[in-house]
């Protein structure tokens, strides 16, 4: 036993616990040769205490029991934790070995970055590249591509037979409880690398974590431990980090930064991303057991670039394909809806049959026979569908297994070629692989032949990609997939259903949106920007909301700002956030945060002329470049927003009777006067960036009647829950229009009239019981006033159906 080899302590005359502890501390620990590793000094110090003879029981009542089991527990710990592997093997992962085993995804493109990395690694000193790029652009893939090239021998002679080891920084730092533990681990790694004589390239992902790693009181961090080896060229290291983290952490340490040569990994183009997706397609098909259509790959690249603006290609496009494939795979593993529906119907019939089993009347017997026949038919349908589902699953699994075998055969071909076994390589290339390809083609052909009647959808299509986009961004799928031609041609008609009497404004908005959708405007600008001018109550704000309904299928997709809150200059900072040193710096800007959370919305600046003039300067970048930088330095994307500014500038010109026709329309001369008035308020560079300035007409009586119909439909929607139908006579509608018509105030007086003359009396009728649920309410004119006709006398209460049955049950 281990305890028998530890030197025995001397007998003490004192009986205090402190005396025994002091003795244990003074005893030399000479058992290092019995330990499999160097991290058990603390446990052996404890064991020294327990090996002291004649410890009085009052001092340590449980010491003797623990002493007998401690060596065995220590040996178990040593068995579990002891690890005599080399440090590189313990704390690293061999990328070249993974590439040799075919476990790395193929790397498409990135030739320039890989070649630049090889050039730096081939230097005599400071042969340390650091890959810098945005998250998701493929920095780690560059090193994986280099590992694959080393295995295939597609590198210069100086790079052949080299190993790329990925260091696990978390594994190095974990367990380093005492001062010196971390340093000894790292030094052992560096020693092993130097012993390899330049055959090992260390790769550290999240390279900026080296700064301060292992830093504690009286110790130095990892970056300072690495500097001497990096400078001498004895250590070849490659790092990967983002641009922001490199600037924030690495560049501050000039001594470390100069030992590395940056390699910029830029975001690939959409075309390059499509090529990358095509290269990864087979891996994802084998993993998920589905077929990925080429159109889905193109859609993933295009839609991710257009709609996911806070991430980078190719990562976001790969995620779309992966999630769509995963969703389809889960559908294969779950029961189809048709089978689940039949199963529920069978359960319902069986429950009803059980309740009718004891009934003896003729009606129940007939019902029971009918249900038994129906149950038999349903069970037959269920069995047929279940057999079909299992058959389709087997067919899909067969294709998946064949593709897996094909991938394995390709790996074996590459391995045989690399090892020089050309006979085996020939058999695989000209026999096994063609046979598997024919098998996959035949299985896929059988699937396509029965596709019309299939329960399972086995191909990832553009619709599946659009569904994932919809979940991630909130854009309705039908907006992405519906033919843009039909939708845009109907835009004028759809907008006129909610914005009345403003045909010219609707046409201007529709034309601007069509221009953008046709791709004839700059992609770096917002979808469109408008300034709506006109008298109050003419539908300027409603126009912005209707635009949101058309584009985003959500009338609430409007980020609205009341400009009366931004009259002072200092309040403008609320939109982008307070500068450093001011109260509220930690909080995000109201405008930037709203657009970041809802990037697909209509941004409405209501009553724009009431804001401070400097606000127009803030919007110059938004209108021209489609972006705005907040107080934290984050760039917010406005490319998928529509900017709408409403203003009452020039309304005194529009309200003059001599300047408008009877139908409320204005002529071009009056419009020119309004625009001239606008130029006195805003700088030319601001007005020049707005796509279109729309002048709204004054509302006519005809337009007000259409608005009344819209408001009555809205009131009817509110009464649906009470199952009340509202009916107005033509006379009542005409009287309401006459009472609510005021050219100066637009449609808002009509809302007040409806509330005072219609809704308030209707509320009184409901409260008094004169109008009940599930009834029709008539509204007519009586004595030249709006009159809501009561259906019952005051205080009348009709029993509800459930109350009637409740009373009947109580009587029984």
From Swiss-Prot:
Keyword Phosphoprotein: no
Binding site for ATP 1: 133-140
Keyword entries, A-Z: ATP-binding, Chaperone, Coiled coil, Mitochondrion, Nucleotide-binding, Repeat, Stress response, Transit peptide
The organelle targeting sequence, given as a residue range: 1-73
Main location (coarse class): mitochondrion
Coiled coil residues, start to end: 337-425
Organism domain of life: Eukaryota
Binding sites annotated in the UniProt record for ATP 2: 534-541
Subcellular location: Mitochondrion matrix
Spans annotated as NBD1: 88-336
S-S bonds: none
Similarity annotation: Belongs to the ClpA/ClpB family.
Domain text: Has 2 AAA ATPase type nucleotide-binding domains (NBDs) per monomer. NBD1 is primarily responsible for ATP hydrolysis. NBD2 is crucial for oligomerization.
Protein name: Heat shock protein 78, mitochondrial
Primary gene name: HSP78
């Amino acid at each position: 036993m281990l305890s028998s080899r530890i030197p025995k302590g001397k007998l003490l005359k004192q009986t205090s616990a402190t005396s025994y502890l002091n003795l244990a501390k003074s005893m030399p620990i000479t058992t290092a040769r019995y330990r499999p590793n160097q991290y058990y000094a603390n446990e052996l110090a404890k064991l020294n205490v327990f090996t002291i003879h004649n410890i009085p029981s009052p001092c340590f009542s449980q010491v003797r029991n623990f002493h007998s089991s401690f060596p065995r527990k220590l040996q178990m710990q040593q068995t579990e934790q002891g690890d005599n592997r080399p440090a590189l093997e313990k704390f690293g992962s061999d990328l070249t070995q993974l590439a040799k085993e075919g476990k790395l995804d193929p790397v498409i493109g990135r030739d320039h970055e890989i070649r630049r990395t090889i050039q730096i690694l081939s230097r005599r000193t400071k042969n340390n590249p650091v890959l810098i790029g945005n998250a998701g652009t493929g920095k780690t893939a560059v090193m994986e591509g280099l590992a694959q090239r080393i295995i295939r021998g597609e590198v210069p002679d100086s790079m052949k037979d080299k190993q790329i080891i990925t260091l696990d920084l978390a594994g190095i730092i974990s367990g380093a409880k005492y001062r010196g533990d971390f340093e000894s681990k790292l030094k052992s790694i560096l020693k092993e690398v130097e012993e390899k004589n330049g055959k090992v390239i260390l790769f550290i992902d999240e390279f900026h974590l080296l700064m301060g790693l292992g830093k504690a009181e009286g110790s130095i961090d990892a970056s300072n431990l690495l500097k001497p080896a990096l400078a001498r060229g004895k250590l070849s290291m490659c790092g990967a980090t983002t641009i922001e983290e490199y600037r924030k952490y690495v560049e501050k340490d000039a001594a470390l930064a100069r030992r590395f040569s940056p390699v910029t990994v830029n975001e690939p183009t959409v075309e390059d991303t499509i090529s990358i997706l095509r290269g990864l397609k087979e891996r994802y098909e084998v993993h998920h057991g589905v077929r990925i259509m080429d159109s889905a790959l193109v859609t993933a690249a295009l839609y991710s670039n257009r709609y996911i603006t806070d991430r980078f290609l190719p990562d976001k496009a790969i995620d779309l394909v992966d999630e769509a494939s995963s969703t389809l795979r889960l559908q294969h593993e779950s029961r189809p809806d048709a089978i689940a529906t039949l199963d529920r119907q069978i359960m319902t019939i069986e429950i009803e049959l059980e309740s009718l089993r004891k009934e003896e009347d003729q009606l129940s017997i007939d019902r029971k026979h009918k249900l038994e026949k129906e149950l038999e038919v349903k069970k037959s349908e269920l069995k047929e569908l279940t057999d079909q589902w299992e058959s389709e699953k087997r067919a899909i699994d067969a294709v998946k297994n064949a593709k897996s075998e094909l991938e394995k055969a390709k790996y074996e071909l590459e391995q045989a070629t690399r090892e020089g076994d050309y006979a085996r390589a020939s058999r695989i290339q000209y026999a096994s692989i063609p046979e598997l390809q024919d098998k996959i083609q035949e299985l896929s052909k059988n699937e396509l032949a029965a596709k019309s009647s299939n329960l399972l959808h086995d191909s990832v299509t553009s619709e599946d990609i659009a569904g994932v986009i919809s979940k991630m961004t909130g854009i309705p799928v039908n907006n992405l997939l519906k033919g843009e031609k039909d939708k845009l041609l109907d835009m004028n008609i759809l907008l006129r259903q909610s914005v009345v009497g403003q045909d010219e404004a609707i046409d201007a908005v529709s034309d601007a949106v069509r221009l953008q959708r046709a791709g004839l405007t700059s992609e770096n600008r917002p979808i469109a920007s408008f300034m709506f001018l006109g008298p109050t109550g003419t539908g300027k704000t409603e126009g912005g909301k209707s635009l949101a309904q058309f584009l985003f299928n959500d009338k609430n997709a409007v980020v609205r700002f009341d400009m009366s809150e931004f009259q002072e200059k200092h309040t403008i900072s609320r939109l982008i956030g307070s500068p450093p040193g001011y109260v509220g710096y930690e909080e995000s800007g109201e405008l930037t945060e709203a657009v970041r959370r809802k990037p697909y919305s209509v941004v409405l600046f209501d009553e724009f002329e009431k804001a401070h003039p400097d606000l127009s300067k803030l919007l110059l970048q938004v209108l021209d470049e489609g972006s705005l930088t907040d107080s934290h330095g984050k760039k917010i994307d406005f490319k998928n927003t529509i900017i709408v500014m409403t203003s009452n500038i020039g309304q005194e010109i529009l309200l003059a009777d001599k300047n408008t026709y009877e139908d409320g329309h204005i002529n071009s001369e009056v419009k020119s006067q309004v625009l001239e008035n606008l130029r006195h308020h805003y700088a030319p560079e601001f007005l020049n960036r707005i796509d279109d300035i729309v002048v709204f007409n004054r509302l006519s009586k005809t337009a007000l009647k259409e608005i009344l119909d819209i408001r009555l439909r809205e009131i009817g929607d509110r009464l649906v829950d009470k199952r009340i139908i509202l009916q107005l006579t033509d006379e009542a509608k005409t009287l309401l229009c006459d009472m609510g018509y005021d050219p100066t105030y637009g449609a808002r007086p009509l809302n007040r009239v409806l509330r005072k003359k219609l809704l308030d009396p209707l509320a009184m009728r409901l409260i008094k019981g004169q109008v009940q649920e599930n009834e029709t309410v008539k509204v007519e004119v009586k004595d030249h006033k709006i009159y809501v006709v009561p259906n019952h006398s005051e205080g009348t209460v009709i029993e509800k159906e459930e109350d009637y049955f409740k009373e009947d049950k109580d009587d029984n």
